[in-house]
Amino acid sequence: MTDADRDASAETREREQAESLARIESGRIPLQAERRLREMATSGAPFSSTLSVDEFALCSKLGLQPLGQVLGASVHQVGWQNLPWSSSWGGGLICELDVIAGAWEEARRRAFDRLAEEASHLGADVVVGVRLHRGAHDWAAGAVDYVVNGTAARLSGSARPGRPLLSDLSGQEVWLLHQAGYAPVGLVAATAVFFVSPSYSTQWARYMTSAVNQELTDFTQGVYAARESALGSLTGQANANGADGIVGVRIEQATAFHSFSVGSSIGGRGDRQGLIITLQAFGTAIRQRERADLSPPRANMELGR
């Protein structure tokens, strides 16, 4: 290879890297990933999947042809989170950290979009067995990461939806859902992040009765507040998609102790301590099919109808 060839190759790599970064900034997948998926779709190479043998057999009976594994990922920076001003810190504080929650939501949206984009390049109708992997935010580092993966599949004898449907249901669960006369509408997910600082009365009660078991009511209330926020968002997404319900709902909760300084702008100086409660909820929205066929399917599964 001549020096001119090496220079041209380096320029090509730099140009492709710049294009990939621009695509990522716009919410798409990198250029190299798209090329690989297009080659997979046209090469006729054997597929790989996360499906077990039983899941593969049942999906085949439903007319779902696995095409390959797909992935979506996003690492998101968390912006500056202000705590609400309060003139009565002695009463405790339970508030939603909307900036942190918003970072989770945006990271998840981009990860889901990239998962669907990868599936589209394979010519898929649906992604089954979606698994979610989330990196808990580090308050100092200020970043969250969201990674999803699953198996892209094509549906025989059915018109393709505009965007591949996403579902965290396994092959067996998709089969049972079809037998019951339902079809998946899509994956729904929500994140709620709350900060709970105990009231002075709660702290005093803990100090005076530290030797006995007792409920920390402020923190319990914070968990309920986070749950109501996350499940409310989950239900809203299902309603927007015309779903009848959500199955397989999973709730994951993480707590982290945090201490910060209280400045004069919020009523005095000192240290304030509390818990950051992060609650993640997700599941698959479903809708009853127009004609529920409880007999074994013959490659005629309908998605979202």
Sequence positions of predicted segments:
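Short, conserved loop-to-beta-strand elements that form functional interface hotspots
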Residues: V126-D138, G245-F257, G263-T278, A285-I286
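Short, well-ordered alpha-helical segments
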Residues: V70, P84-R131, Y207-F257
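Intrinsic disorder/low-complexity detector
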Residues: T2-I100, G142-F219, F260-R305
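Short, well-structured alpha-helical patches and their helix-loop capping segments
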Residues: A103, A107, D138-V144
